[in-house]
């Protein structure tokens, strides 16, 4: 057996648990297939696949139908010619502490950890792999109910702009890569549930549980993903602030965010409009398409707000009671007002002193 291959199968193995692996000092290496990595990965991890999807499927089939020995033999025959190349892709990280993971902490991550250790790397395996990480994340999210200051207001009022500028905030739309509206995916690549939850955990796991957090009022679903149930409950019970701005201001802010930059974007927007025929009627949709092609974007946005967004918002929020109402015409002033409201909040559970 060649030395590289022998080390791949029989080298030393060091392993750690999820909480240790997530320390900033670790560089995470995901040796699963690129398809697995895309479907869900630990944020910040680098994908260095040991097999491609077809190879993994073949090895898994052998394991189930013939047995472990046959699967290992086949996997070894696939890996052997590529070990030198695989090693070279990781050489740039040799000075770092590496943590290798696969799906469940099985042969893929064990073999790579042994191999890299024999080649002089500081390396350890993540016990339980990505499955253990997911369990760790979900355990946290199922119990994460922080005190929240929830910003409400009609579309275009500036909620997202404020969330991005406020200290101690969570930008759910950024984590989801979706603006939580029918046009919310324009210019963005929405994330799936697993990656959203991983990023949500990374953003929140170190926050003090008693400290108020700013968040934008959302429904349970943001684009393709669902907000964790415990956090959604915290949003319902949080301090609610209503932001107000003129139609002119709202139109301007929406245009800055969504402005059609090319023909592809215009085509996407027009395609989405077709889905509104039932709620707006054919005539209004055709009017909107005409305005879009005439580059009359301000008129286009105004009609959408008046006939679609505002009525839906009023219906969904009519039973809400707000702790505070603020003008959002001047966002710098609104930011100062919100920070003042935040500073006035006592320890979680006591009544606010702000007036």
Residue ranges and their predicted role:
Residues 43-44, 146, 234-239:
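Short glycine-/polar-rich loops that comprise or flank the Walker A/P-loop
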Residues 1-43, 137-154:
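Flexible, polar/low-complexity N-terminal or interdomain linker segments that lie immediately upstream
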Residues 108, 147-167:
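Glycine-rich phosphate-binding P-loop
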Residues 167-234:
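Conserved nucleotide-sensing/catalytic segment adjacent to the nucleotide-binding pocket
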Residues 234-239, 244-355:
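Conserved NTP phosphate-binding and transfer environment spanning the P-loop NTPase/kinase superfamily
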Residues 22-92:
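Positively charged, proline/Ser/Thr-rich regional signature most characteristic
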Residues 125-138, 255-259, 269:
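Long, charge-dense
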Residues 73-127:
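Catalytic cysteine-centered active loop of the rhodanese-like fold, especially the PTP/DSP P-loop
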